[in-house]
Swiss-Prot record:
Belongs to the Lgt family. It is found in: Cell membrane. The gene is lgt. A 1,2-diacyl-sn-glycero-3-phospho-(1'-sn-glycerol) binds at residue 137. It is a multi-pass membrane protein. Catalyzes the transfer of the diacylglyceryl group from phosphatidylglycerol to the sulfhydryl group of the N-terminal cysteine of a prolipoprotein, the first step in the formation of mature lipoproteins. It is an enzyme of class 2 (transferase). HAMAP family: Lgt. This is Phosphatidylglycerol--prolipoprotein diacylglyceryl transferase. It comes from Symbiobacterium thermophilum (strain DSM 24528 / JCM 14929 / IAM 14863 / T). Its EC number is 2.5.1.145. The keyword Membrane applies. GO terms for molecular function: phosphatidylglycerol-prolipoprotein diacylglyceryl transferase activity. Pfam families: LGT (PF01790). GO terms for cellular component: plasma membrane.
């Protein structure tokens, strides 16, 4: 469905080659994450030079996990009928829950091989992820996807003109859920950045990321129109978000009870 008639999802057209805004935004988010990851790694007593080699493993694993999750968990009825679309990731369809799973598996294999501390690096990744997600959600805006149910009149009146026009589908203004999640991710990043600067115990930042992001995702998912369902009316993304948020709470309690490591603040 054409969501933004006034925005072309293709940024640059060179002959048969189309460079889409979605791809530009995702690549920009990844590049910023790698750069910031080096700075945050140094703060945690890690080698910033390791970030590049880690990213070479983590980024493809995350993208692969995001795509596999989108195709085989969320949208298999569609892709089973359109197998030619499976590899067309530039058209959208990268699920963050799959990216986290794919990245976690790759990190769990790669970091011990390089004798690197898993949870310290998890904190670095957990810190940059919400910022990358906040940026990446604007790829949904340009790619004309991830909008919600019809918005109430009071909200429509508060929307700036460009957003109201962009969210109008068949004469009805829809919830800009991509924007809600982008803002929530920015708030999550801000909270985690404060925790990072306070040198909280190893594992706390990543655990809080799981809790905060997934709590917001659980709420926002309830009004999205592109949700996938299982067992009748249970939204897959909400179920996964609930499980990951609970996992985050368990990990958070565990890390807070552990003795502080070198480089942690002993008081938190």
């Amino acid at each position: 469905m054409q969501l933004l008639a006034f925005v072309d999802p293709v940024a640059i057209q060179i002959g048969p080659l189309s460079i889409r805004w979605y791809g530009i935004i995702i690549v920009s988010a990844i590049a910023l994450s790698i750069w910031l990851g080096g700075r945050f790694a140094r703060d945690r007593g890690l080698d910033p030079a390791f970030v590049d080699s880690f990213a070479i493993i983590l980024v493809p694993a995350g993208i692969l996990g995001a795509r596999l999750y989108e195709v085989f968990v969320l949208q298999w009825p569609y892709y089973s009928q359109h197998p030619d679309k499976i590899l067309q990731i530039w058209e959208g369809g990268l699920a963050i829950h799959g990216a986290v799973l794919g990245g976690a598996i790759a990190a769990a294999i790669y970091l011990p091989m390089r004798k690197q501390p898993f949870w310290r690096w998890a904190d670095v990744v957990g810190l940059v992820l919400p910022l990358a997600q906040a940026i990446g959600r604007w790829g949904n805006f340009f790619n004309q996807e991830a909008y919600g149910d019809p918005a109430p009149d009071w909200l429509v009146r508060l929307m700036p003109g460009w957003l109201r026009e962009g969210m109008t589908i068949s004469g009805t203004v829809m919830h800009p859920t991509f924007l809600y999640e982008s803002v929530w991710n920015l708030l999550t990043f801000g909270i985690l950045l404060v925790c990072h600067r306070r040198r909280m115990k190893t594992g706390v930042v990543f655990s809080l990321y799981l809790v905060l992001y997934n709590a917001g995702r659980f709420l926002i998912e309830s009004i999205r129109q592109d949700s996938s369902f299982i067992f009748g009316r249970i939204r897959v993304a909400q179920l996964v978000a609930a499980v990951l948020a609970i996992l985050g709470l368990v990990l958070l309690a565990w890390f807070l009870r552990r003795p502080a490591e070198s480089g942690d603040s002993a008081g938190v």
